[in-house]
Regions:
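Long, intrinsically disordered, low-complexity segments
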Residues: 7, 59, 64, 72, ...
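An aromatic- and glycine-enriched ligand-binding surface/loop that stacks and positions planar moieties
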Residues: 8-77, 178, 186-187, 203-347, ...
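Conserved, well-structured interaction surfaces
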Residues: 32-36, 40-50, 71-150, 172-176, ...
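Active-site beta-strand/loop architecture of penicillin-binding DD-peptidases
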Residues: 332-380, 546-547
């Protein structure tokens, strides 16, 4: 939102022991404050010091969606992600469970109280329904995220909180989860507008609801319903492709015309050490994502396989990746010029000397800037267009599917750039005239044959365009799992050969050493250990298979 009010303390249980239980619902101003407290759960929690709560939104979201594909890699305890070695006690998975249910808990408390509010306190007759819609949409978003990670999860409803209902079983089927999520999104979709309430960007909107409702339908393989929601976003929504791909992740530049929903991290007066003591709107992308050669921690490297797979002319490579020999256009630092960092890999764990320009946009700690004002853009139009393409192919409309891919690739080759401006990249990176873009069907037919994919041509095209368009964002591994493509992905993109049979061999070739064979059970993550220990209705026998 333009100004997001933090209500962490206001919504904690102990506050209900001090204030009357209906205090939040006596005035409309109090209702809005309570609603803002639910929005606060999109942000990090800088007080708990638990798991990855301090980088919530980035971890585990980006890690669970990318590192298991091996396109993104990390050292230290985060190496478990790309090695498929995660366990039920992994802190990131604990954070995902805890933080998602924190949002659900707040939404349930709010919805229970809102239903008792006197309608006369609202200045507009529609306001109460709008506040309900926003709360239900956020609850549905969190439930949907939990199902992507864990499958069946306990469903707390208004009247049930983590305190009042510490023990609740998983439902028998995913359909029970999906039914509640669908009801919430449909209600919110029909109440909310395309534009955010009061022009406060950061609030959920009709576009948010439609995009995530479509995601739910795609999980259910109801492609016709998903297609209708996605088509509406493209045809009726206010969104357009940003002309320059490089403008999508600029520092302190929020809500491009392409953005459907993002979590804004603004530039603040003080962003040095200790700034997080007064604000949860702090996150340190720079330290996590910069090259270790230049002060990074090694949490976000990209693979040489990803780098080598880009087609000549695809500008998404230069706008989103900086590799050995490249110079970061924001910091002026060249990768691989320092002894011990000058190979294809660096460090004792052999991390690729390849990094994401989406998040490494400053010198970490330089001028006492510890935290970074870059939005987490959870949904944008390009992703919706690729989802729509998939649904078109699944419903027999191949021509429209290929047209969506054509439009995405047209922007990727810079053909929307003539006449555009770029905020931070060198201006001479912009195209001044249009160029010819290779035909996607022709190219991917050759790529499919070369790599040995067995899926339909359109599936290869869609997943590869997601790879390039949404690298290091929020969906790739989840899409591979949903589409049933994981096994062939690893065989095609990260094959085990004589040339990469050991880590030492990989040092010579730039290949990533794959520590695992794909197992279908790992397309879900394990229920966190703490939940099994504390929830008497979920025992070890209820753990996801394989863990």
């Amino acid at each position: 939102m333009g100004t997001t009010t933090s209500c962490d303390d206001f919504l904690e249980v102990d506050q209900y022991e001090i204030l009357p239980s209906d205090y939040m619902f006596k005035t409309e101003a109090n209702v809005i404050t309570g609603l803002n407290g639910i929005y606060d759960t999109f942000y990090t929690d800088q007080e708990t010091k638990l798991g990855d709560d301090q980088v919530w939104g980035f971890k585990p979201h980006v890690f669970a969606a990318n590192h298991p594909t091996m396109d993104c890699q990390a050292s230290g305890w985060d190496a478990e992600w790309q090695r498929h070695a995660w366990k039920p006690d992994k802190e990131s998975l604990e954070s995902a469970w805890r933080m998602s249910y924190r949002a659900i808990d707040r939404a349930n408390r709010f919805l229970e109280g809102l239903a008792t509010a006197d309608p006369s306190i609202f200045a507009d007759s529609k306001s109460q329904a709008i506040y309900e819609a926003e709360a239900r949409a956020i609850r549905a978003y969190n439930y949907l995220y939990l199902t992507k990670l864990y499958g069946r999860v306990p469903m707390l409803v208004p009247g049930e909180t983590y305190s009042s209902t510490p023990s609740k079983p998983r439902p028998e089927t995913l359909d029970e989860n999906y039914a509640t999520i669908e009801q919430d999104f449909v209600y919110a979709r029909d109440v909310l507008d395309w534009e955010p309430l009061n022009g406060q960007y950061g609030r959920v909107t009709k576009g948010f609801c439609k995009a995530y409702l479509a995601e739910l339908y795609m999980k259910k393989k109801d492609y016709n319903s998903a297609k209708a929601e996605l088509k509406s976003i493209i045809d009726d929504g206010p969104y357009k492709l940003e002309p320059c791909y490089g403008n999508l992740h600029n520092e302190d530049t929020h809500w491009t015309k392409e953005s459907i929903f993002e979590i804004m991290y603004h530039k603040q007066d003080y962003m040095g050490w200790g700034a997080n003591s007064s604000s949860d709107a702090m996150i340190w992308f720079g330290f996590m994502c910069a090259a270790p050669e230049w002060g990074g921690w090694g949490s976000m490297c990209l693979s040489w396989e990803l780098v080598r797979s880009f087609e000549p002319g695809d500008k998404r490579r230069q706008y989103s990746i900086v590799a050995k020999g490249d110079t970061n256009p924001f910091t002026g630092q060249t990768v691989g010029v320092t002894p011990s960092f000058d190979g294809l890999f660096q460090g004792s764990e052999n991390m690729p000397t390849v990094y994401s320009l989406k998040y490494w946009r400053c010198k970490p700690g330089d001028n006492n800037q510890v935290y970074n004002p870059i939005s987490l853009t959870l949904k944008r139009l390009a992703g919706v267009m690729l989802d729509y393409a998939e649904c078109c192919f699944e419903t027999g409309d191949a021509a429209t599917g290929w047209e969506m891919i054509r439009q995405i690739r047209n922007r990727a080759w810079g053909n929307l750039e003539p006449g555009a401006t770029v905020a931070y990249f060198p201006k001479d990176w912009l195209n001044t005239e249009t160029v010819e873009v290779p035909d996607a069907q022709t190219y991917y037919a050759q790529y499919k044959a070369k790599k040995g994919y067995t899926s339909d041509l359109w599936k290869v095209a869609v997943i590869m365009e997601r790879r390039y368009e949404l690298n290091a964002e929020f969906s790739l591994y989840h899409d591979l799992c949903r589409m049933g493509m994981c096994d062939e992905w690893f065989k095609a993109e990260y094959p085990k050969t004589a040339a990469n049979s050991t880590p030492d061999e990989c040092l010579k070739t730039g290949d990533s050493f794959r520590y695992f064979e794909h197992q279908a059970y790992q397309e879900l993550f394990p229920i966190p250990t703490n939940e099994i220990l504390s929830n008497s209705a979920i025992g070890p026998e209820d753990q996801n298979p394989g863990y």
